[in-house]
């Protein structure tokens, strides 16, 4: 029971730390379900299905694999995502990964600084 309580406290602290770092950077932050799969979602119908069925606020292709490996190895992890497109028919044209990545790096660094200080 003590281990579970410590894990929940750590999880809460990690989430709050990430949110605080994003807020300090003036970046909108949302917490919620992120759907993950093995393909780039560029289809409004599929996007709507994921949102309606799983209440997903986003979808991606990498975080689920990392989380699964961490779970198998009994290693705790958190996934922090930056949204780069709208996961619809215009996704390929609206993808702006480089700009999103550049905006995200300082937030991740600040979150780590806050978490470990």
Predicted regions and their residues:
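Glycine-rich phosphate- or other oxyanion-binding loops that anchor nucleotides, phosphorylated ligands
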Residues: 1-2, 14-117
């Amino acid at each position: 029971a003590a281990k579970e309580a410590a894990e929940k406290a750590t999880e809460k602290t990690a989430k709050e730390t990430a949110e605080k770092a994003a807020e300090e950077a003036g970046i909108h932050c949302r917490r919620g379900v992120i759907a993950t799969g093995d393909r780039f979602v560029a289809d409004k119908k599929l996007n709507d299905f994921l949102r309606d069925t799983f209440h997903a606020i986003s979808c991606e292709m990498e975080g689920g694999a990392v989380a699964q490996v961490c779970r198998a190895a009994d290693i705790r992890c958190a996934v922090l995502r930056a949204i780069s497109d709208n996961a619809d028919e215009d996704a390929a044209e609206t993808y702006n990964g480089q700009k999103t990545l550049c905006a995200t790096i300082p937030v991740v660094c600040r979150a780590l600084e806050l978490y470990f200080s």
